[in-house]
Amino acid sequence: MNPPAKTPWDEVGLTAGEYRLIVDILGRPPNHVELGMFGLMWSEHCSYKTSKRYLALLPQTGKRIVIGPGENAGVADLGDGFVVVWKIESHNHPSAIEPYQGAATGVGGILRDIFTMGARPIACLDSLRFGPLDDPRVRYLVGGVVAGIAGYGNTTGIPTVGGEIVFDECYRDNCLVNAMCVGLLVGDRIIRGRAEGPGNPVLLVGNRTGRDGIHGASLLASREFDEKAEEMRPAVQVADPFVEKLLIEACLELSGWDGLVGINDLGAAGLTSAASEMASRAGTGLDLDISRAPRREAGLNPYEVMLSESQERMLVVVKKGREGEALDLFAKWGLVAAVIGQVTDDGMLRIRDRADNPTDGAPGELARDASAVGVTGAATALRIVAEIPARALAHDAPAYDRPMAEPAYLAEVRKLDLDRLPDVRATGAIRLGTADPAVGPPAAAMLRRLLASPNLASKEWVWRQYDHMVRTNTVVLPGSDAAVLRLKREEPAESKASTAGAVDSVDSVGAVGAGRTAEAPTRGIALSTDGNGRYAYLDPFLGGAQAVAEAARNVVCAGAEPVGLTNCLNFANPEDPGVMWQFRRCVEGLAEACRVLETPVTGGNVSFYNETMGRAIFPTPVVGMLGLVEDIDRRMTAGFKRTGDAILLAGETRQELGGTEYLKLVTGEVRGCPPALDLTREKALQAFVLEAIRAGLVRSAHDCAEGGLAVALVECAFLGESGARGLEADVSAGAVPKPPGIRLDALLFGETQSRVILSCDPACEPALFDLARGRSVPLSRLGAVSDEVFVLRSGSAVVLREPTSELARLWREALPKALESRLAGTRFVRGDSTMTTVKGDDQ
């Protein structure tokens, strides 16, 4: 039987009901170009038609937040004249099809969201998810994605300073690539993406328009994959970081020019999105002559021009009569720019093209002749090829209340009978050779297995490929709890700023940027991305809350006050009621944690349809946290500093093994209830740790998370300074209940939340215990830092004794061994992610 013929709305990812609504809005059937434009803007990726009713639950205001959701990125005032812009977004589907270009264009897109607002990008982070490394295709994806991130970030001169990378079976078919960027405002103005002032000219700047990326938002990113997914490769955009670098400098110079009205990047949905959003935000219209759009190739029809997602392009509105100055500025930077239209006052997005340019023969074209509006020297033989209310495209997509139901799998996977799981044993607890199946493996052997697992092993192989020191502001390198950057003044190339049009004087929105003092301590920011898909799979509410708590805890461990967050919510098909239930519960968990921890959400991204032929990813919320380091000299790192320092545990250890890396390693399953999270205790813990750091009472601080207490302690030793890379510690200290009421594997490898490992001069212990009591935070002494031997006890029993150097070697070599031996001869180059074999000196 032949499959049913596709309807015109099917071809652009719309439903029959949505098509009827479009007919009602226009008062007529849409033509082919208009239907394609609606397909883009009403896609799940662009319109948030399923998610926006739930995203409204997230707190969006805070004492330092200047701009929340709705603009290109969030904005926070950090005081002393520093204004920071930051956002995270996904590029999952393109990266799964074409890993190098998908990842590279993901970085490029998030950079443009930042410098569009007048901020210089100063750092990138990435949160990555892949399938198991025994799969050759997964290894190909890992190599391509990492190379794409490195190739784009390194070329544009933006340091990639942190992130995370996780491997799990559920991401085998659908990898996740979430890119975050942070920028520092140049001058004292936030640039808005608004097309204000009827009669003002509109410029298209940057790369020439090509056929790459067509249907990227409507079909590639808004549907689950099937067996024909590879056929969507042309929908993946092509990156050019060299043009992006020129755009950064040109747009930042433009931000200091008094002729600028508004600017928006052409990201997902390309010119259609940028034009409709700029007009809709301002309540205006745009009249564009796309025959004047610079093109990469001949023969592009209006449908292709409006749907193209060619990268490194910006739409700019300037004051009438000042367009020549803008064109000169872009020419100085070697960028192609053209005036393609003007702002109107009728609210319509009107697209014109040459009358002799075919549209591809689609029926229903608007047949009226029309002269160009406001384009000097334009050809007169033009016709209108699309005419749509801008707001209908950008903001009036239908909102769905999709059915939801708790997934049936939860009742089964939450069952965990620990009586059937042999506990690990201490060194020498039984004679070697015992065959009793009820006796578990030695704790030392299990620690080695965990340290060699891809999820816990060192990610240095990844971050060494990124230039994390460019611009020389990175003061805490990748590998610690959070990256820390020094804040330095960013001055505009030209300072002719005015508050006219859509350009806000930052001082006009709450005295932002005021109060600069030369005597103030050097400030910094701490940045972290966090999320645990296993926890969210077992309990979406808890998984959402935990992502916020851990991200905040990480920046606190760096000596920073959490300011706010951006998030990327990665889920499977929202048409599945179980997925919608997961999404709602996860957002509710995020919202609750944000309220309690006072970390408002400034924006982000929702990525649905991360599913292939019924195989769904875990619900994966990723949080990008921004923290303020008031004095960069008080920043904190995870590694031990001096032999003899006391090692303390803030928080309690409970018997919680559900959803842990340890449980997955020994059983091959993700099950049980994930570790509980008491947000009131979490807030008290973070306040205690931050106060202790600012008071100079501690020498190191490290979040105790994936892998549990034993892994966290050994990481502190690995990251320690020379001569302070060992320890002797009692892991039962701080346990609730005390042994023998708690299993040894739970003591060592359980992932109880709200715990931080501290080290300090023994003379500071009394002050720390006093401070902890005042905050009602449990604090226990585990032991002391030593030289090069790693010793763990439970009470008087030695659990394990290992040379730190041997454990460190295993930890550092695990990921390169898993990847490099299999990627030998593989080269990923800009513009082509195909694997090629090279030999000898070429490697």
Question: Model-flagged regions — what are they?
Answer:
Residues 498-516:
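Compositionally biased, intrinsically disordered low-complexity segments enriched
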